[in-house]
């Protein structure tokens, strides 16, 4: 489940740290979260799609590592990102 150009641009504009930012950890987490939610919806209807399930688990692991990085750099940025994306709790 890939993201379209417009959808990527909207995510970048929403989560960028500075005007020329396109690849910060916050932007990457936002893109992964969107892809994870799309793939989760796909897997609810296609239970036996095991390759997609494996890709989903890899994306979740990548997002977890990026969130750990953001948290190690700034607890404030981490909590703001979690609230903005409504990921935890």
Swiss-Prot record:
Gene Ontology molecular function: rRNA binding; structural constituent of ribosome
PROSITE patterns recorded: RIBOSOMAL_S15 (PS00362)
Region: Disordered, residue numbers: 1-23
Keywords, alphabetical: Ribonucleoprotein, Ribosomal protein, RNA-binding, rRNA-binding
Record field: compositional bias (Polar residues): 10-23
GO terms under biological process: translation
Family matches, as Pfam families: Ribosomal_S15
Keyword RNA-binding annotated: yes
GO terms for cellular component: cytosolic small ribosomal subunit
Keyword Ribosomal protein included in the entry's annotation: yes
Family: Belongs to the universal ribosomal protein uS15 family.
Function field: One of the primary rRNA binding proteins, it binds directly to 16S rRNA where it helps nucleate assembly of the platform of the 30S subunit by binding and bridging several RNA helices of the 16S rRNA.
Subunit structure: Part of the 30S ribosomal subunit. Forms a bridge to the 50S subunit in the 70S ribosome, contacting the 23S rRNA.
Protein name per UniProt: Small ribosomal subunit protein uS15
